[in-house]
């Protein structure tokens, strides 16, 4: 846990310091939306940079957790498509909120992104020329495509830290405690961007708190799929897809505010809580993994441990892995096992 705390402090201080340099040194902020958006993309890679530096200091391999794994499983597909389902549910729930109606319109887009007056009419004409169903389909298609390509690459910069390095540093911690810790760090890490109007342009101060709530809830989902798939790549895909499709909510709702609207508001929080509850039911009563009740290390090691038979023969330890016997001792193959795994077993 000390390693996780060390990383969390360093990544936040480093990221916030870089933001301070860009903000006060180059004037990047709420008044420069293009510059802020560009820096936000760069900002996403600071968790990766911090993790790599600490790994170099600690003499750890790049993929010491084994989670930079591109083996596709069914859970990848679920994590990729789930954001689309959640966004549609979010729109429906948003329509039940006070002062909000379900209506295909451009006004929410104009207000949310503070479109200049001389461009507002053009935005209205462009949206009115597209039927609602076509807008929805195009957003879904482009969002899913971006979610597994450019957005996933950008999200990898964050997820290598949150759902890879921190997971490796918290092997002994149980799922819920780890998810809460990682989500909280992920949320407060965003605070300079939030104060500049990112995600909550009309309520930046309250937005800092709302972002922490969002990150904790979204972090539970992402961590579950990482442990289920034994790969942090699935978190990058899910993160990238959420970023790509969540904007669809502003096309089909009218009214409301930053507290209520979208995946980062109350509507999205309700959807994610319901989704987490469904996963809890599945994990407890249907799945054989029971990830939510285990430590991160046990969840990650289950795929190995289930195939390992250990027997003792005097001073030797025999490990039968996949039908092949490995005998410990000087120069034996077992000595080449991942040191982190051997240490954990000891």
Language-model segments: residues:
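C-terminal membrane module of polytopic membrane proteins
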Residues: 204-206, 240-313, 318-322, 331, ...
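Residue-level signature of the transmembrane alpha-helical core
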Residues: 12, 45, 80, 144, ...
């Amino acid at each position: 846990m000390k390693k996780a705390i060390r990383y969390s402090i360093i990544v936040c201080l480093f990221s916030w310091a870089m933001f301070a340099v860009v903000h006060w040194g180059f004037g990047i902020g709420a008044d420069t939306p293009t510059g802020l958006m560009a820096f936000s993309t760069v900002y996403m890679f600071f968790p990766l940079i911090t993790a790599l530096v600490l790994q170099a200091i600690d003499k750890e391999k790049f993929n010491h957790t084994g989670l930079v794994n591109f083996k596709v499983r069914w859970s990848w597909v679920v994590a990729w498509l789930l954001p689309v389902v959640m966004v549609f549910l979010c729109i429906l729930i948003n329509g039940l909120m006070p002062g909000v109606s379900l209506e295909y319109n451009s006004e929410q887009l104009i207000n949310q992104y503070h479109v200049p007056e001389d461009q507002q009419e053009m935005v209205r004409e462009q949206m009115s020329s597209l039927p609602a169903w076509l807008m929805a389909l195009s957003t879904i298609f482009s969002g899913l495509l971006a979610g597994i390509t450019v957005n996933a690459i950008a999200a990898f910069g964050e997820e290598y830290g949150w759902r890879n390095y921190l997971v490796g540093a918290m092997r002994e911690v149980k799922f819920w405690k780890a998810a809460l810790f990682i989500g909280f760090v992920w949320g407060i890490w965003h605070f300079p961007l939030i104060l500049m109007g990112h995600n909550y342009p009309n309520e930046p101060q309250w937005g800092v708190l709302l972002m922490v709530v969002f990150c904790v809830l979204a972090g539970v989902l992402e961590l579950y799929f990482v442990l289920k798939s034994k790969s942090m790549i699935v978190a990058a895909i899910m993160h990238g897809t959420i970023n790509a499709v969540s904007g669809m909510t502003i096309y089909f709702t009218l009214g409301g505010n930053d507290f209520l609207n979208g995946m980062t508001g109350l509507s999205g929080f309700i959807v994610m809580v319901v989704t987490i509850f469904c996963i809890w039911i599945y994990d407890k009563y249907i799945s054989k993994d029971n990830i939510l009740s285990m430590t991160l290390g046990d969840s990650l090691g289950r795929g190995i441990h289930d195939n390992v038979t250990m027997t003792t023969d005097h001073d030797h330890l025999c490990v039968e892995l996949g039908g092949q016997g490995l005998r410990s001792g000087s120069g034996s193959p077992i000595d080449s096992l991942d040191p982190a795994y051997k240490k954990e077993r000891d």
